[in-house]
Amino acid sequence: MFSQIISTSDIFTFTIILFVELVIGILGNGFIALVNIMDWTKRRSISSADQILTALAITRFLYVWFMIICILLFMLCPHLLTRSEIVTSIGIIWIVNNHFSVWLATCLGVFYFLKIANFSNSLFLYLKWRVKKVVLMIIQVSMIFLILNLLSLSMYDQFSIDVYEGNTSYNLGDSTPFPTISLFINSSKVFVITNSSHIFLPINSLFMLIPFTVSLVAFLMLIFSLWKHHKKMQVNAKPPRDASTMAHIKALQTGFSFLLLYAVYLLFIVIGMLSLRLIGGKLILLFDHISGIGFPISHSFVLILGNNKLRQASLSVLHCLRCRSKDMDTMGP
């Protein structure tokens, strides 16, 4: 299995970080969904960008709760680990949820690009005028990749779950998918989940590179659009900080943050693959888990800071909490 031993302190640190990430994920994504739904109810309408943003927040909110359920399931009901259908279901749900989380974020980036960028190209103008249909088409095409990703699960040679308790060891040799290696401790039990064929991570990384490439192209095209707009403003001797320039900059800031977090996430996946084949280090795989959860959670807070409505709502909530805290202090003994 593995030669490296993870200490109890490493597991404790990992658990604390994971717990903090999950709590932040629930609060952040729940906040985005709640604000947009309340605004939708109040105005009786919702913009296309808010529709994508709300769907993304709900997807990630469910993802966080799915991770919590998985952890509780593995720690409180360890006997379920020996059932291949349970682990298969977990792997499939993870793939589906991760797929929509990444592709909805990509759709949001493409939507901002088509709305903000300015090109005289006829194809770009055609797509710009039909931005809603473009986003819908991206979702539909991504479903093909999702189906292919799920079908690729049949390529597994062996998936094993070892449960160690004293001198007792159980092994499940069914071909069952799971995103990566996991380790959970429950009392004296240690569960090591590993895919000996090393097929999942390369295939999943390949499918994740597709939305990353789409987002990167949209980001680079937005930079080019800003450069052209800036040159045009210089020729016309107009102020450099007009509304279009600010919209470009704000979209670029959000896009850059998403790509940076995405790149770090993919980097950890690559490191995880290398650690499986070469290093054999479990600590790297623990950080792989942390980065996998931290990527969508961190991006959600980037979206809050980059959206005027969400940022103002968050500031209002913080102001109310600060006022309530002061009131409680004055009422105290």
UniProtKB/Swiss-Prot annotation:
Entry annotated with the keyword Transmembrane: yes
Sequence intervals crossing the membrane: 14-34, 61-81, 90-110, 134-154, 206-226, 256-276, 284-304
UniProt GO MF annotations: bitter taste receptor activity; G protein-coupled receptor activity
Disulfide cysteine pairs (residue numbers): none
Gene3D superfamilies on file: Rhodopsin 7-helix transmembrane proteins
Subcellular location: Membrane
Glycan-modified residues: 186, 195
UniProt keyword terms in alphabetical order: G-protein coupled receptor, Glycoprotein, Membrane, Receptor, Sensory transduction, Taste, Transducer, Transmembrane, Transmembrane helix
Family: Belongs to the G-protein coupled receptor T2R family.
Note: Several bitter taste receptors with distinct ligand specificities are expressed in a single taste receptor cell.
Free-text function comment from the UniProt entry: Gustducin-coupled receptor implicated in the perception of bitter compounds in the oral cavity and the gastrointestinal tract. Signals through PLCB2 and the calcium-regulated cation channel TRPM5.
Name of the featured protein: Taste receptor type 2 member 110
Annotated organism of origin: Mus musculus (Mouse)
